[in-house]
Amino acid sequence: MPRHHAGGEEGGAAGLWVRSGAAAAAGAGGGRPGSGMKDVESGRGRVLLNSAAARGDGLLLLGTRAAALGGGGGGLRESRRGKQGARMSLLGKPLSYTSSQSCRRNVKYRRVQNYLYNVLERPRGWAFVYHAFVFLLVFGCLILSVFSTIPEHTKLASSCLLILEFVMIVVFGLEFIIRIWSAGCCCRYRGWQGRLRFARKPFCVIDTIVLIASIAVVSAKTQGNIFATSALRSLRFLQILRMVRMDRRGGTWKLLGSVVYAHSKELITAWYIGFLVLIFSSFLVYLVEKDANKEFSTYADALWWGTITLTTIGYGDKTPLTWLGRLLSAGFALLGISFFALPAGILGSGFALKVQEQHRQKHFEKRRNPAANLIQCVWRSYAADEKSVSIATWKPHLKALHTCSPTKKEQGEASSSQKLSFKERVRMASPRGQSIKSRQASVGDRRSPSTDITAEGSPTKVQKSWSFNDRTRFRPSLRLKSSQPKPVIDADTALGIDDVYDEKGCQCDVSVEDLTPPLKTVIRAIRIMKFHVAKRKFKETLRPYDVKDVIEQYSAGHLDMLCRIKSLQTRVDQILGKGQMTSDKKSREKITAEHETTDDPSMLARVVKVEKQVQSIESKLDCLLDIYQQVLRKGSASALTLASFQIPPFECEQTSDYQSPVDSKDLSGSAQNSGCLTRSASANISRGLQFILTPNEFSAQTFYALSPTMHSQATQVPMSQNDGSSVVATNNIANQISAAPKPAAPTTLQIPPPLSAIKHLSRPEPLLSNPTGLQESISDVTTCLVASKESVQFAQSNLTKDRSLRKSFDMGGETLLSVRPMVPKDLGKSLSVQNLIRSTEELNLQFSGSESSGSRGSQDFYPKWRESKLFITDEEVGAEETETDTFDGTPPPAGEAAFSSDSLRTGRSRSSQNICKTGDSTDALSLPHVKLN
């Protein structure tokens, strides 16, 4: 449980403290009001004074700083001079040991124990010298035992063997005792139960048997008992077990067992088949040779022959005599020897592989220390960060700031003179040691005078020292600076609380606060450099051991690279799409999903859409540029036609993600017409667009002609010879435009902007119609449109005149062609000019009137035309459009044309046209919507 290091006026919890033995005795005697408390966590001889002296021994108390300061300073001094007391465990229980047990806790004792255990059980370095000496002793005993069996050397070998056996008994006896004792360094072999567990190990059992046999043989020889010597000669065989104990760690047996276990299946298979061959061959040879050859009289003789033959030993004591037996022996020998020889090859290859693996493992074990060092450096660099709150990480660096307390200098010197070793006392007696003492004395002299005065006058208050070294005396060890004010205590009491007994007898205390920020920065930089050095050393140990390691590294790197490439390809597919498809697959998908829009959010789909839109825009811009250039070049002509501009027809192919709902709708006329003739437009006939411009000064008799003929020609019927004409016509490429008189001056394209207030602009115009030339293949009709915003009142005044002229046209018997304005349901977005659509009010222009009114109207509004837009925009045709008059079958002399300002569309038309006329065939003419935007 961590202690609370933040001090305060009320005194924070100081941690878990347990009453020590010496302090308990003092409390029981009643000598001092305070009782000594032991720091459970630190395990050092730190003594606290607690006011609760009546509490029992071994009780866990939650001590406070205020309670610790309640006792007097005399008891503290006596407790320091006395014995420190028993050590406490982490659970607060006192650890009491006897004098012999406390000796075992000595560091030197543990060091020697570990050293001897490593020499005997884990020999390294010069420890092999001792084991080589023991091996020579054992091998010498073996040689002398051999010579003792030879009659010529029996006497000399026996005397030498007796001396050598005495030496062996002494060496083996001492070694066995040391082994049992040094095994206590391992936690599992501590105590008498642990020692018995260690003595039951196989090699310890062998040592015990050899030692007992050697003692028995030597004791029998020294007594001269002949019968005992002859009876104990068999014990000499047990002395051969000394050779077995040479491999104390059993590495050889472990290696053999691992090889056999690794190749157990192969060995069992070879031995099983070899045993079957041995049985069958011996039995068949026995059946053949038992009558003719006395050497094979029994089946046991045949098995002996088979074993010697198949193992390729071949003593030759037994051989088959009959030819049938020899043939069987040869056949089974060829078959059986191959299986009997398999285990040798399997074990040989297994040993080779195992040895190579052990060498590689040793090479890999060399990486442990660099790896551990690297981990340690990484953690220290992390713990030394500016934002780190770690305290223990600065502990190794506090030794540089280690200073001694001046107030206890005499006592410290006295105790250190008793506890210092001879080497250290000699060093302190040297001039260098005297300089150290003088520095310590100067440190004590640099104390502030106010400190001594305050300590004598008020035992409960003391000020901080002036020097840097003495400032650490009154701070708790390894304690962070607290924002709360620290209590001011007596100097001796503070020393009793915060000072730590050093092993050399000097009381010293250094705080983390003494490490200034620049010093911490330097430590941090050093740790970072150590980290980089450790990383470089660790990388050096990662070098491949052999070619197999290189291949493994390359294969692992290749697999990692493939995984990374696959992951990268998956991400690229998610961003850009699935790449290009084959042409067949493209065609199939295009047929099945011709009008379906894909919702693929990939980058590839977006790029394709953008490319299609850019291509559409480029084609439109090219068309507009061609029109503009033609207008500039032919501006002086009397009539400029858009058909002569060679406008490329716009395809209805979907080039973007916009669709027009009109693309598949039929615009038909009213059902109230007397007769309708529906003509579906051909999909492969492209429309041409004719734009006939007139001079600036238009004649009074301006008119428009709508004449659908067999060739869909647009004709012009002038009222007089001075009339100019302005015709907007859409027809096929084969259409022709009637010649118009040359204008007086060049003219520009000026179209008045549409007005929402204009509903009907009508002028009386002679309209010629040729119903006999109407063909099913005709896809367009001529549409003429001229409008001006100044002619609103003029058009309304002529509306009554238009109706009066209709009756005169009926009397003349001329054919009247009535064109009804079409009301599209929902034009949507144009396929050809989708980005240039602007909605305007519907403008229906009806032209009627006499020559004078037309001349007067043209003179009124044409000079006031301002710069107009080049394109006629699309308008929504409302239900409140001007009603179209219907006529009977009597052919009137004149006609009236009502045209809607629907969008001029180019490209293949999928809508039907209905032309309504009177006569034998009653047709309805539906004008196609043409967008020029």
Curated annotation (Swiss-Prot):
Strongly expressed in brain. Also expressed in colon, lung and uterus. Pfam families: Ion_trans, KCNQ_channel. Phosphatidylinositol-4,5-bisphosphate (PIP2) is essential to activate KCNQ5 channel by inducing the coupling of the voltage-sensing domain (VSD) and the pore-forming domain (PD). Calcium suppresses KCNQ5 channel current through calcium-bound CALM C-terminus. Therefore CALM acts as calcium sensor that controls channel activity. Zinc potentiates channel activity in a pH-dependent manner. The activity is modulated by small changes in cell volume. Activated by the anticonvulsant retigabine. Inhibited by linopirdine and XE991. One of its GO terms (biological process) is potassium ion transport. The keyword Transmembrane helix applies. Signal peptide: none annotated. Residues 1-126, 179-201, 254-267, 348-933 are cytoplasmic. Residues 583-598 have a biased composition (Basic and acidic residues). GO terms for cellular component: clathrin coat; plasma membrane; voltage-gated potassium channel complex. It comes from the Eukaryota. Residues 371-379, 522-529 are annotated as: Interaction with CALM. The chain crosses the membrane at residues 127-147, 158-178, 202-222, 231-253, 268-288, 327-347. Keywords: Cell membrane, Ion channel, Ion transport, Membrane, Phosphoprotein, Potassium, Potassium channel, Potassium transport, Transmembrane, Transmembrane helix, Transport, Voltage-gated channel. Residues 300-320 dip into the membrane without crossing it. GO terms for molecular function: voltage-gated potassium channel activity. Residues 148-157, 223-230, 289-299, 321-326 are extracellular. It catalyses: K(+)(in) = K(+)(out). A 1,2-diacyl-sn-glycero-3-phospho-(1D-myo-inositol-4,5-bisphosphate) binds at R249, K265, K362. Residues 405-465, 578-598, 878-933 are annotated as: Disordered. It is found in: Cell membrane. Homotetramer; forms a functional homotetrameric channel resulting in the expression of a small M-current. Heterotetramer with KCNQ3; forms heterotetrameric M-channel responsible for the native M-current. Heterotetramer with KCNQ1; forms a functional voltage-gated potassium channel. Interacts (via C-terminus) with calmodulin/CALM; forms a heterooctameric structure (with 4:4 KCNQ1:CALM stoichiometry); the interaction is calcium-independent, constitutive and participates in the channel function. Pore-forming subunit of the voltage-gated potassium (Kv) channel broadly expressed in brain and skeletal muscle and involved in the regulation of neuronal excitability. Associates with KCNQ3/Kv7.3 pore-forming subunit to form a potassium channel which contributes to M-type current, a slowly activating and deactivating potassium conductance which plays a critical role in determining the subthreshold electrical excitability of neurons. This is Potassium voltage-gated channel subfamily KQT member 5. It comes from Mus musculus.
